[in-house]
Curated annotation (Swiss-Prot):
GO biological process, one term: mitochondrial pyruvate transmembrane transport
GO-annotated cellular components: mitochondrial inner membrane
Chief location: mitochondrion
Protein name listed in UniProt: Mitochondrial pyruvate carrier-like protein
Species name: Bos taurus
Keywords: Membrane, Mitochondrion, Mitochondrion inner membrane, Transmembrane, Transmembrane helix, Transport
Transmembrane residue ranges: 23-42, 52-74
Membrane-related topology note: Multi-pass membrane protein
Function: May mediate the uptake of pyruvate into mitochondria.
GO molecular function terms attached to this record: pyruvate transmembrane transporter activity
Length: 181
C-alpha cells in the first residue's frame, strides 16, 4: 500500500511541474491525441462488413503510420506517444487489410454470392442446388423432376449486380459500389 501512495505522490509532483504543463500545451502531446482517432476508428470498424474496406486507403494508412512511427522515434526529443499511436494504427490497419484480402480474395465474396444465388435459383426454378444437396434439404418440386442446378452459381450474370434491373452503379473516391433497391 505504501508503494501505491508513493507512486501517486510522485505522479502528482510530476503533473505539477512546468515541464509537464508545457508538454500538455505542445504539439508533441496534441498531435498524437488527434492521431489516435485513426486506430480507434479502425478498431471500431472491425465489426462492420468487410465490403466497405478500401484496400488502397488501408495500404496507404499502413505506409503512412510506418513513416511517422520512424519519425516519432528519430525526432529529438522522441515522441513516444506518437510512436505508440502509429504502432497501434499499423496493427489495426493490418487487421483490416487481412479482412479485406480474406473477403475479396479468400472466398468471402464468392461464398456469400454463391449461397444467395443458389437460394434464389432453387426457389425460382424449383430445382435442387449444390448447397441444398450437401445439407440434405430438397425442394419438393425438384424431387419430381430430379434436376440439379449447379450452373446458376457459376454464371457471370448471377454474380454481376448490373444484370439486375434495379441496380445503380455509384462511383466515389475510386470505390465502385452497387446500390440495389
Amino acid at each position: 500500500m505504501a508503494a501505491v501512495v508513493a507512486l501517486c505522490r510522485k505522479a502528482m509532483e510530476t503533473v505539477k511541474t512546468k515541464e509537464f504543463r508545457d508538454y500538455l500545451a505542445s504539439t508533441h502531446f496534441w498531435g498524437p491525441v488527434a492521431n489516435w482517432g485513426l486506430p480507434l476508428a479502425a478498431f471500431r470498424d472491425m465489426r462492420a462488413s468487410p465490403d466497405i474496406i478500401s484496400g488502397r486507403m488501408t495500404t496507404a494508412l499502413i505506409f503512412y503510420s510506418m513513416a511517422f512511427m520512424r519519425f516519432a522515434y528519430r525526432v529529438q526529443p522522441r515522441n513516444l506517444l506518437l510512436m505508440a499511436c502509429h504502432g497501434t494504427n499499423i496493427v489495426a490497419q493490418s487487421m483490416q487489410a487481412g479482412r479485406y484480402l480474406n473477403y475479396h480474395y479468400g472466398g468471402g465474396t464468392t461464398a456469400a454470392t454463391t449461397a444467395a444465388v443458389s437460394a434464389a435459383s432453387a426457389t425460382s426454378t424449383g430445382s435442387v442446388d449444390s448447397s441444398a444437396t450437401s445439407t440434405g434439404s430438397v425442394d419438393s418440386s425438384a424431387t419430381s423432376t430430379g434436376s440439379v442446378d449447379s450452373s446458376a452459381a457459376t454464371t457471370p450474370a448471377a454474380e454481376d449486380p448490373v444484370a439486375h434491373s434495379n441496380c445503380q452503379e455509384i462511383t466515389c473516391c475510386y470505390l465502385v459500389t452497387w446500390d440495389c433497391d
